[in-house]
């Protein structure tokens, strides 16, 4: 059985990179520009809300579709 992600699920940088196909530099540049919120640091680990990742991905797709 595979776990289904909820809007408040936490995802890491590896997940975001795998899901978008972009590398660390691209992702961190998007954080600097404000397109992706900064990660929440929880017990020394950087995590994003799945909801924030989805919004970020939708922004990328809408820009690509013009």
Swiss-Prot record:
Superkingdom of origin organism: Bacteria
Keywords linked to the UniProt accession: DNA recombination, DNA-binding, Repressor, Transcription, Transcription regulation
Biological process annotations from GO: DNA recombination; negative regulation of DNA-templated transcription initiation
GO molecular function: DNA binding; identical protein binding; sequence-specific DNA binding
Function: Transcription inhibitory protein for the torCAD operon. Also acts as an excisionase and plays an essential role in the defective prophage CPS53 excision.
Oligomeric and partner information: Interacts with TorR. Binds to the effector domain of TorR. This interaction, which does not interfere with TorR DNA binding activity, probably prevents the recruitment of RNA polymerase to the torCAD promoter. Binds to DNA.
Protein name: Response regulator inhibitor for tor operon
Native source species: Escherichia coli (strain K12)
Upper classification of the organism: Bacteria, Pseudomonadati, Pseudomonadota, Gammaproteobacteria, Enterobacterales
């Amino acid at each position: 059985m595979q776990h289904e992600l909820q809007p408040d699920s936490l995802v890491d940088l590896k997940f975001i990179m795998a899901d978008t196909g972009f590398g660390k530099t691209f992702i961190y540049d998007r954080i600097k520009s404000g397109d992706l919120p900064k990660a929440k640091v929880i017990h020394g680990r950087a995590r994003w809300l799945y909801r924030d990742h989805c919004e970020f991905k939708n922004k990328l797709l809408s820009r690509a579709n013009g």
